[in-house]
Regions:
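Flexible loop and strand-edge segments within Gram-negative outer membrane beta-barrel domains
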Residues: 417-462, 469, 477-499, 540, ...
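Charge-biased low-complexity segments
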Residues: 23-181, 192-203, 212-226
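C-terminal beta-signal and adjacent terminal beta-strands/loops
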Residues: 795, 799-824, 837-844, 848-903
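Periplasmic N-terminal accessory/gating domains of Gram-negative outer-membrane beta-barrel systems
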Residues: 188-190, 197-209, 225-325, 335, ...
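Transmembrane beta-barrel wall of Gram-negative outer-membrane proteins
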Residues: 355-379, 393-431, 447-469, 510-514, ...
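Membrane-embedded beta-barrel scaffold of Gram-negative outer-membrane proteins
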Residues: 141, 470-474, 480, 628, ...
Length: 903
């Protein structure tokens, strides 16, 4: 810092005292001719500092002003004049200062007397050592509770360190300009490092939100601490991330973290018993699900009551309903990514839990200093629980799932910042949906069996420069059986698939403002299929039917095999501009699809099968951008192209079309996020998606050979989703989500032939209407969810969830006639998807009590679904003559009491 130093020099060049000559003694008794004598010099007792003139500071030179000062007999300054100038600015400053001087007066002949003195006022510009200034400070809070954390060490590599105070605040003075590695650590925190840059003339103020470590019993602390320096990771532009602890406490989930996805914006409410994910108007199979980079076929067990992965292995779950980056593909809809947590290096940990739905357990322990393992599992018994409290076979009216799942995770440390994880998963589901009838021959059933297993290995390496490498090979097996008996010949589809994949990614900083990810994403499958029964079962999206309707009398059988392979390289770069306020993330993915089917035409006795191979290479550009206009207000937008290979079950030469190619979609979205407080945020997103080349059933009653399915359908979805969220902080968390959406389809009519039936009514209502959009079978106009949970203290917590969803579209039955071939009533349909199932409305509540000891903790809870006992319709059903309409309803009030103990 530059400071002005003012000096002054007193020059007693002359003294001007009154002079007189006396011929005789004056009145004072002085003899004539006495000469006055200065007996005491004036002494400066108050010095007034003159400011160094601002106009002269740039020149930086010294200056002196010589003045004559008149001092009276009391020591005051009565006048001052410039004798030697240094310039107007210096002269004015000196005159103003000396007029405020005061002196111990001079004495002449030992008496106070007025005098005039010559005074030199010196101006000297002196450079002093600058005062240390704060140019880097910040505050540290708990990522979950948002409370400040005291005692956290913040270290700047090669400079020094500071410790946060009770307010979580820290500060550094005179940190050298440029980039610095910052390490933040504490005894109960996960150590993190980041990179910050200090610029000239600017103070850097930051806020860090740190994640607490898992609690470790006393005496079991780990000496292993791994710190890496990594560039910031960009999330998808539109995504919602839920931490495991927050998800576990959501009412209606019974402590299952992954079930919270059903309550997020953009997700339609699935019908009970389906467990389907319908995101932004896409079909359930169009949304991709990954666990640590491993693709799995489903997120929930049959019925949607439980997820297929133990919540205690989950670190976080992220839902991107659309517009996601180039790292992922092969889906037209949303993206769900689940990250499993790191295993604890010391101590034996685990939990056991049970409620009326199922029981679950997990054990986690180290094998040695570098290897640790966790094993988890779950088994349902809901049917047995319900049989205790009801006098009737509830399974005849409500679909009751039967399931189990198991997981194993092993982590081995190869060295600092280098490890291998092995993850194994398995799940099995059975679900039966029944429509009873006094006549056993008329009982209608829908049965499904799903098995899948996965084993994956993840090699992770993070380098000192912040770059990282991730390699994830995986393999697995899927087995699916569906069986329908709605009168006539039963229909069955048996699918067996061996699947495999490999993901490789390198991520690093390529410049001061860019982070680039380069990767390879491989997936393939070898599948076999066996199908018998009606050519119209199971029903497809767009089919006009009602539950329990006897299938058409066209039956057939087929067995076939398929293989699929896609090896997709991708690149994505995050470009930060304007001090990281603007991020532009361009990316591109090259997706080659190779598909083979074993039969191009149906099997004919004595003729060898002729297979077919289809190949296409798709270019998928993606772009997203975020702009943080002010600290609390940001904007975002994204678009991208997406492709999806045909389902293997659709490549039958009898029931499908072996020449099917890829389906296509385009996503466009934009929105904003406003941070109301540190804990409360509001987000709104407008979205639009367009899909083409969708696979639909051939509209013709007599399709050409191997063309039971065609690929000229179109789809579109558009709407707005909003999310008002209070993050887990202190005692409360919750959110309000709402989605207003319309999802439509346009069917292919190019191969339509005249429909025939005795009355002609069916043809009029079932025929395709060229160019006309209709409602998607899973369309829901309004979906709203309100979730809240409050810690009452003393270990008690209460929460509630309210859900509202528009019912799915259905095609009305406007009449019936007796078919001549089967002597059964056949329905006459109205306009396709012109009515809806009544709206779904449900209130759930949860109350829990937690206990904590030094050796473990426990929780007991009561989670009540459908508190009001509302009979929510799930499907429309008719009697045998289609004159009376009813509904299959969901579960009544379901109180789920449970307990959990962990150590």
């Amino acid at each position: 810092m530059v400071k002005k130093l003012l000096g002054a020099t007193l020059l007693l060049a002359s003294l001007c005292a009154p002079r007189a000559s006396f011929a005789q003694a004056n009145a004072n008794g002085e003899t004539p001719g006495h000469q006055p004598k200065l007996t005491k010099l004036p002494k400066l007792v108050h010095f007034e500092e003159a400011p160094y003139p601002d106009s002269e500071t740039a020149a930086g030179h010294s200056a002196s002003v010589v003045l004559q000062i008149a001092i009276d007999e009391k020591g005051g300054v009565t006048d001052a004049v410039v004798l030697q100038t240094a310039g107007p600015a210096f002269d004015a400053a000196a005159l103003a200062a000396v007029r405020k001087f005061s002196f111990d007066p001079a004495e002449v002949d030992n008496k106070p007397s007025p005098v005039k003195i010559t005074y030199r006022y010196d101006f000297v510009l002196k450079i002093e050592a600058p005062t240390p200034s704060i140019n880097y400070d910040g505050e540290i809070k708990n990522r979950f509770t948002k409370q400040p954390i005291a005692g956290v060490k913040v270290a700047i590599e090669g400079f020094g360190e500071a410790t946060t105070d009770d307010a979580g605040h820290f500060e550094f003075r005179d940190v050298p300009l440029g980039k610095h590695v910052i390490t933040v650590s504490g005894p109960s925190l996960t150590t993190v490092s980041t990179e910050e840059e200090l610029e000239k003339g600017k103070k850097l103020s930051v806020k860090y939100a740190l994640e607490p470590k898992e609690e470790v019993p006393p005496g079991e602390e780990s000496d292993l601490e791994i710190v890496v320096i990594a560039p910031k990771i960009a999330k998808e532009v539109v995504s919602t991330e839920i931490k495991a602890e927050e998800g576990r406490r959501v009412p209606g989930t019974q402590g299952d973290t992954l079930k919270v996805v059903q309550n997020l914006p953009g997700v339609a409410r699935a019908s009970f018993g389906s467990g389907a994910l319908v995101v932004w108007g896409a079909a359930p199979q169009d949304t991709r699900i990954y666990v640590d980079g491993i693709h799995i076929p489903l997120l929930y067990h049959g019925g949607g009551l439980r997820s297929v992965l133990s919540s205690d292995l989950v670190k976080s779950i992220n839902l991107a309903p659309g517009g996601y980056g180039s790292e992922y593909g092969r889906g037209l809809g949303g993206l769900v990514t689940i990250d499993t947590r790191a295993l604890r290096p010391t101590g034996v940990h685990g939990f056991v839990a049970a409620d009326v739905i199922d029981s679950a357990a997990m054990v986690e322990a180290p094998i040695n200093d570098t290897t640790r393992i966790a094993v988890a599992g779950r088994k349902s018994y809901l049917a047995q629980s319900l049989s205790v409290v009801t006098s009737k076979d509830v399974g005849d009216f409500v679909p009751i799932p039967d399931y189990y799942d198991a997981q194993v995770k092993v982590t081995h440390d190869l060295g600092p910042n280098e490890s291998i994880d092995v993850l194994g998963m398995a799940a099995r589901d059975e679900l039966t949906r029944t429509l009873t009838n006094p006549d056993p021959a008329e009982v209608k059933k829908d049965y499904s069996l799903t098995n899948f297993g996965r084993v994956g290995l993840a090699y992770k390496r993070q380098f000192n420069d912040g770059s990282s490498v991730l390699l994830t090979p995986w393999a697995g097996h899927d087995h699916l059986v569906t069986r329908s008996s709605f009168g006539g010949a039963p229909t069955e589809l048996d699918t067996s698939s061996n699947v495999y994949g490999f993901r490789a990614a390198y991520r690093g900083r390529t410049s001061a403002t860019t982070v680039t990810t380069v990767g390879l994403d491989v997936e393939g499958s070898v599948s076999s299929y066996a199908r018998t029964g009606s050519v119209t079962l199971p029903p497809r999206e767009g089919d006009i039917t009602v539950f329990g309707q006897p299938p058409g009398d066209q039956v057939n059988a087929d067995t076939w095999h398929t293989t699929t392979l896609s090896v997709a390289p991708y690149v994505q770069t995050d470009i930060g501009l304007f001090e990281d306020k603007l991020h532009i993330v361009p990316g591109v993915r090259v997706e080659p699809f190779i598909t083979t089917a074993s039969r191009l035409t149906p099997e004919v006795a004595g003729s060898p099968p002729i297979g077919i191979t289809s190949q296409s290479t798709e270019l998928e550009p993606r772009l997203s951008s975020t702009y943080q206009m002010i600290p609390r207000l940001g904007f975002k937008g994204a678009f991208g192209f997406y492709h999806q290979s045909p389902e293997g079950s659709d490549l039958s030469s009898v029931f499908g079309n072996p020449t099917l190619g890829v389906e296509r979609a385009f996503h466009l979205l934009g929105g904003s996020t406003f941070k109301l407080t540190d804990q409360v945020s509001f987000e709104e997103v407008l979205f639009y998606s367009k899909s083409s080349d969708l696979v639909t059933r051939n509209a013709s009653d007599t399709p050409q050979l191997s063309r039971a399915l065609v690929q000229q359908g179109e789809g579109r979805a558009y709407g707005i989703q909003v999310l008002l969220r209070h993050e887990l902080s202190g005692r409360f968390f919750g959110w309000v989500s709402y989605t207003l959406m319309r999802s439509e389809r346009k069917d292919d009519c190019s191969e339509l032939e005249t429909q025939t039936d005795p009355t002609g009514v069916m043809a009029a209502h079932q025929a395709c209407v060229p160019g006309q959009w209709r409602l998607f079978d899973f369309d829901q106009t309004h979906v709203a969810t309100i979730v809240g949970s409050y810690d009452l203290g003393a270990g008690f917590e209460f929460g509630a969830r309210f859900r509202y969803a528009t019912g799915f579209p259905r095609t009305p039955v406007v009449g019936a006639f007796i078919g001549t071939r089967r002597d059964l009533y056949e329905p006459e349909f109205g306009a396709q998807n012109s009515i809806r199932i009544p709206a779904f409305v449900q209130l759930d509540a949860r109350v829990s009590k937690r206990f904590k000891w030094s050796w473990g903790k426990a929780e007991i809870y009561l989670d009540v679904q459908n508190v009001t006992d509302r009979a929510n319709p799930e499907e429309i059903v008719y009697d045998y003559s289609y004159t009376k309409k009813g509904y299959i309803t969901g579960l009544p009030t379901l109180p789920v009491a449970g307990a959990r103990f962990e150590w």
